Design a protein with these regions (language model features):
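N-terminal maturation segment of proteins
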Residues: 1-368
């Protein structure tokens, strides 16, 4: 906490910190990065489905009252934000903040539409949504006007980053050492991909699913294959809730030309992504099989998940590959190496942005 108050200061530097209407559940037990207290998490309410397996449903009167009370905090919060941010000169954070509040406007518009359709008599909730939307739109406009005036760096610098690693995250590395490790991982993944391509040179390339039906069938079969392999190899205990936790994160079909980096691989073999989604098993375990001790029942107060969750999910991609998950589909190993190359490159982009070597737009070009 002391480091956040003294150095990071999201409440004084980062406009996006005040975007308090959250639309998507975090894939870690505790949200990554600073999250403002009192955030309104829409997926806690049936009007906003938490997963692709859930459907929109009407709010009870108690739920509507609770949601309205949460949304009524938005306008005073954003009014206070203007004063709190007055001394911030972090240009990239201001530019990024504009989009954060544009997205909050879009979310509140969608929420208003759903409430009109399913809770038309909840006038107080509708009024609270309108008030929050107006305040959000006004702050977005103010940020657009102010952003060009903010010209300072947004990264905290290498010295502060190293201190954060060592004394807050308890990772015994410096910024420079993380750069060295990440560059080495990028080179290792790149070389491994070339070896894999040479090994598979006589094999046909993986074909991408060309229709929604084919993509759904591909995802269904890959989940079944993954869970069956875990049982057969005794890698871990397969719990009854694990299949649903994966199915909750199934993606819609994307036609060729609209597939992002991850969809390019996922439309050929979704298994590498399912191995990465270890994240959601962490979440489901905490939610569905709570620890008997109240101290260990929820996310730890020390947010170890900021490093553990993504690191663990990424390493699972390679662990499962080396244990034989793709023995029947050698070309899928190429997807794993490509994904690992991407994650290493993204890591370098993040490190260089914190060091103010790259701005956020340049780092974003790497981030995918």
């Amino acid at each position: 906490m002391e480091y956040h108050l003294r150095v990071l200061q999201p409440f004084a530097r980062d406009p996006a910190y005040y975007a308090s209407v959250k639309t998507e559940e975090s894939d870690t037990p505790a949200e990554e990065g600073p999250t403002i207290h009192g955030a309104v998490r829409l997926w806690h309410y049936p009007i906003w489905p938490r997963t692709v397996l859930d459907t929109v449903a009407a709010l009870t009167p108690a739920q509507a009252a609770e949601l309205a009370a949460g949304l009524r905090t938005v306008a005073p919060l954003l009014e206070q934000a203007r004063g709190n941010l007055a001394g911030s000169d972090a240009r990239d954070l201001w530019v990024g903040g504009v989009r954060a509040f544009e997205e909050q406007v879009e979310a509140l518009d969608a929420l208003a539409t759903r409430v009109r359709a399913r809770n038309p008599r909840e006038g107080e909730l509708a009024a609270a949504i309108a008030e929050a939307r107006g305040a959000t739109a006004r702050l977005a406009g103010w940020l657009r006007e102010e952003a060009p005036k903010r010209t300072g760096p947004s990264g905290i610098g290498t010295a502060q980053y190293s201190w954060y690693l060592r004394h807050v995250l308890l990772v015994p590395l410096t910024w420079e050492e993380e750069v060295t490790i990440t560059r080495r991982e990028l080179a290792r993944a790149h070389a491994s991909l070339r070896l894999e391509e040479q090994r598979n040179r006589a094999r046909p390339p993986l074909a991408a699913a060309a229709t929604p039906e084919a993509y759904r069938a591909l995802q269904d079969s890959s989940i079944a294959r993954y869970l069956a392999w875990l049982r057969e190899t005794d890698v871990l205990t397969v719990e009854p809730w694990m299949e649903r936790a994966l199915r909750e994160r199934m993606h819609p079909f994307a036609p060729e030309g609209r597939r992002n980096f991850f969809f390019q691989g996922n439309h050929r073999d979704p298994l590498p992504l399912w191995t990465h989604l270890w994240h959601w098993w962490d979440n489901a375990r905490i939610r569905l099989t709570p620890h008997p001790s109240p101290i260990r029942r929820g996310p730890l107060l020390y947010n170890v998940w900021m490093s553990r969750a993504e690191g663990g999910a990424t390493v699972m991609e390679e662990y499962m590959m080396h244990m034989g998950l793709y023995d029947g589909s050698p070309r899928s190993r190429e997807i794993v190496w490509i994904m690992l190359m991407n994650r290493a490159a993204r890591g370098l982009g993040n490190l260089y942005a914190h060091a103010n070597v790259l701005d956020m737009a340049q780092a974003g070009d790497i981030h995918v």
